[in-house]
Amino acid sequence: VFMLVSHRARGESAREVGWRLDNFFEAARLLLPPMLIVTMLLVGVGWYEGTLDFGRWEGGQTIMGVPGLSLIWGVLQQYALQGFINRRAQVALGRGALSVLLVASLFALFHLPNPWLTFATFAGGLLWAWVYQRAPNILAVGLSHSLMTWVMISSVPPGAFHNLRVGFKYFG
């Protein structure tokens, strides 16, 4: 609710925030090469470790009941990260490296104390913030987030990301 009130107070339209389709393919074009490279690396790790399983989800659960929720969750996280935080970072620091670094750092901080997930979200945050600043499209970066999460979970050993736990749940 706070973000919606903030958008209204600043006079930001849904289109300006990134809820649009006219630049979806431009955003996808920017996202696709790094996504393919990371996917090949992660699938290679999964193949080498013998942990490759595209049906696996957190804690060994099947992914079959999760896709819709995962897609929504990725889009919502990217709305908060890009549509709100990135836009405010650009106001404070300008478009470019400093605001991209701030956005990626904040995204990583939200995933502490999980070390590998913090690293992965920093790397993903760099890509998504950079792409959003060039082609602001929440749906494209949100779908990318969801797909890369699925690839990561399906490829690396199940315990590597501690079942995606963050905060105090990481220790439980």
Locate each region found by the language model.
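Alpha-helical transmembrane segments in multi-pass membrane proteins
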Residues: 1-10, 30
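Juxtamembrane helix-loop-helix connectors linking adjacent transmembrane helices
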Residues: 11-76, 86-87, 91-92, 162-172
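Hydrophobic alpha-helical transmembrane segments
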Residues: 28-32, 63-67, 97-102, 118-122, ...
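Functionally important transmembrane alpha-helices
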Residues: 118-172
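Membrane-interface helix/loop boundary segments of multi-pass membrane proteins
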Residues: 79-102, 130-137
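Membrane-embedded alpha-helical segments of multi-pass membrane proteins
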Residues: 1, 63-68, 76, 80, ...
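Hydrophobic, membrane-inserted alpha-helices
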Residues: 100-109, 124-128
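Aromatic-anchored segments of alpha-helical transmembrane domains
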Residues: 38-48, 104-113, 146-156
